[in-house]
């Protein structure tokens, strides 16, 4: 059995190696010739899986995408060809939620503000939006959720309109899939008109798809409204973001919000589970066996934690400042953008850290130990 796998997908050999011969490829430049004799195709979001790519892949039985989204895959065509498809919904949700929360802690410190007491609007209440909301709520922040699709589907959570979020939220974090049609399309959801409605000093984070915001309109807006702070992980035209916009963002990264070791491992593992299920093979591997021991796996708390100390603790698993600096130095070429994503292998999630001494909650801005547990620390 021949398995074609994206070279940036981790743990493929550990999980699929005993099932067949693995050939690693550049997912962004994958050609029909490379997949024509494949039995299994494992991809990420950079690969467009459609008729053009797999028209000659007559042996292909399984396509797995280690992503939460499916907009890069022609699922109807795969169904027509009777090719089994699966993705990995929720695999990186925790990583994205923690990225958004850590970014907010970083903004608060940079601009001498407290995150506590702010109102956060989450646009998109799927897996990543829910994970982000969980972090914010664990920290005691008021969270407003906007997701008209979920509301129509009968989700019982309380939802508000996007206009309400724009009017009331101090921070807006975007977590929607990209859709170009329909009443609730998300392509250019934040266009020039909507950007101009943002209240003073809003923090705007985009952790989903670059085209959810009109990037050219955002450049014009930010040049006039520097009070609005931007954290951008996704860009129109990836892997070639607009240089003007990178310069204007407070924090800029190359579509790696979901790139924790845990999230990457979970994505590949979910595909492995599905493939074993499809073939009626036993699942011989475990997710836990893939992850290395974290160098700071046990932390002793010396007392109460302030917000600033929580940020320092967060930087042990992920220091956003490093990625921001590195990205600004390499984003100018598509090769640099993708190379940084490929080399992004060090980030962990809060769960990698165990706190071994409880802390007391005080009313002077210090952190409740149950809050740390709810954030994901052990």
Swiss-Prot record:
Tree of life domain: Bacteria
Pathway: Cofactor biosynthesis; pyridoxine 5'-phosphate biosynthesis; pyridoxine 5'-phosphate from D-erythrose 4-phosphate: step 2/5
SUPFAM superfamilies membership: Formate/glycerate dehydrogenase catalytic domain-like, NAD(P)-binding Rossmann-fold domains
Pfam families on file: 2-Hacid_dh, 2-Hacid_dh_C, DUF3410
E.C. no: 1.1.1.290
Major subcellular site: cytoplasm
GO cellular component, one term: cytosol
InterPro entries: D-isomer_2_OHA_DH_cat_dom, D-isomer_DH_CS, D-isomer_DH_NAD-bd, Erythronate-4-P_DHase, Erythronate-4-P_DHase_dimer, NAD(P)-bd_dom_sf, PdxB_dimer_sf
CDD domains hit by this protein: ErythrP_dh (cd12158)
Binding site for NAD(+): 147, 233, 258
GO biological process: 'de novo' pyridoxal 5'-phosphate biosynthetic process; pyridoxine biosynthetic process
Keywords: Cytoplasm, NAD, Oxidoreductase, Pyridoxine biosynthesis
Record-listed substrate binding positions: 45, 67, 259
Subcellular location: Cytoplasm
Transmembrane segments: none
HAMAP family the record matches: PdxB
Quaternary structure note: Homodimer.
Functional note: Catalyzes the oxidation of erythronate-4-phosphate to 3-hydroxy-2-oxo-4-phosphonooxybutanoate.
Similarity comment: Belongs to the D-isomer specific 2-hydroxyacid dehydrogenase family. PdxB subfamily.
Protein name: Erythronate-4-phosphate dehydrogenase
Gene: pdxB
């Amino acid at each position: 059995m021949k398995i074609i796998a994206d070279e940036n997908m981790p743990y493929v050999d550990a999980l699929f190696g005993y099932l067949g011969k693995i050939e690693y490829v550049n997912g962004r430049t994958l050609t029909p010739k490379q997949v024509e004799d494949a039995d299994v195709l494992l991809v990420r979001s950079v690969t467009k899986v459609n008729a053009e790519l797999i028209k000659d892949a007559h042996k292909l039985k399984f396509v797995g995408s280690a992503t939460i989204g499916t907009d890069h895959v022609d699922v109807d065509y795969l169904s027509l060809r009777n090719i089994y498809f699966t993705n990995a919904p929720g695999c990186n949700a925790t990583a994205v939620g923690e990225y958004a929360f850590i970014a907010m802690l970083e903004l608060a410190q940079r601009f001498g503000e407290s995150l506590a007491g702010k109102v956060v609007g989450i646009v998109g209440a799927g897996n990543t939006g829910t994970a982000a909301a969980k972090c914010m709520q664990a920290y005691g922040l008021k969270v407003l959720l906007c997701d008209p699709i979920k509301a129509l589907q009968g989700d019982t959570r309380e939802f508000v309109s996007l206009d309400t979020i724009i009017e009331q939220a101090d921070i807006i974090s975007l977590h929607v899939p990209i859709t170009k049609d329909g009443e609730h399309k998300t392509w250019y959801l934040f266009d020039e008109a909507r950007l101009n409605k943002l209240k003073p000093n809003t923090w705007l984070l985009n952790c989903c798809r670059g085209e959810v915001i009109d990037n050219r309109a955002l450049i014009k807006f930010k040049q006039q409204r520097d009070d609005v702070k931007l954290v951008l992980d996704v860009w129109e035209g990836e892997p070639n973001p607009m240089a003007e916009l990178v310069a204007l963002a407070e924090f800029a990264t190359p579509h790696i919000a979901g790139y924790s070791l845990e999230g990457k491992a979970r994505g590949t593992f979910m595909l492995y589970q599905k493939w074993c299920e499809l073939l009626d093979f036993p699942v011989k591997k475990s997710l836990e066996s893939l992850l290395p021991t974290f160098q700071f796996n046990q932390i002793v708390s010396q007392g109460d934690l302030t917000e600033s100390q929580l940020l320092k603790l967060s930087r042990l698993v992920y220091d956003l400042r490093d990625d921001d600096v590195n990205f600004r130095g390499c984003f100018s070429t598509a090769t640099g953008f993708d190379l940084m994503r490929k080399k992004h292998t060090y980030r962990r999630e809060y769960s990698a850290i165990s706190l071994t001494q409880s802390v007391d909650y005080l009313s002077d801005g210090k952190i409740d130990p149950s809050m740390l547990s709810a954030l994901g620390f052990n």
